[in-house]
A protein has these predicted regions:
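Transmembrane helix-loop-helix hairpins at the membrane interface
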Residues: 52-168
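Juxtamembrane helix-loop-helix connectors linking adjacent transmembrane helices
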Residues: 1-66, 158-168
Length: 168
């Protein structure tokens, strides 16, 4: 990836993080309406309880590993390796969204489509912004924050199962 130290201003990073949250949540809500006819639709199985020790490990591993692996692959290799602008944006964005379609792994076509459509607007936006600016840091910060939020939700539902039951 083409990171240059000092290139990222704090206000740009903040703007990217906020826009990632808005585009990400908007994509999930819209996909929920398209696939399930419910607005807003939130898939409760995404933060279902797991053994507490795994939830604690997940809290530390998920944000770091997925942020570096996914952004390095789809932005660093995907976007940077393709010469045509729109193909460089759309192909990595497509596979970025496909990857998230199977988390959690449910062999249900509607759920897979919901997950794909949830992430597609965000992954297109991320790939477009990176293609235009070649600065991965704000995207990685936003991605890390989204992953921390997911890990915190999983930790809470795992530590206090009653919280998850209230969501159903």
């Amino acid at each position: 990836m083409e990171y240059e130290r000092g290139k990222c201003k704090w206000y740009v990073a903040l703007l990217i993080v906020v826009s990632m949250l808005l585009v990400g949540m908007g994509g999930m809500y819209l996909a929920g309406y398209v696939c399930y006819g419910v607005f807003p639709y939130m898939a409760p199985m995404m933060i279902a309880p797991i053994p507490l020790v795994l939830a604690i490990i997940n809290m530390f591993l998920l944000p770091v590993t997925t942020t570096f692996a996914e952004d390095g692959l789809y932005l660093g290799i995907g976007v940077n390796s393709i010469n045509n602008k729109w193909i460089a944006i759309l192909v990595p964005a497509f596979f970025y969204a496909i990857q998230h379609s199977f988390i959690p792994m449910l062999l249900d076509g509607r759920h897979i489509m919901y997950r794909f459509l949830s992430f597609l607007p965000l992954t297109i936006w991320i790939c477009y912004w990176y293609y235009k600016n070649k600065n991965p840091l704000p995207i990685m910060i936003g991605h890390g924050i989204l992953n921390v939020a997911t890990a915190v939700n999983i930790l809470v539902t795992s530590a206090v199962p009653g919280v998850y039951e209230m969501m159903l």
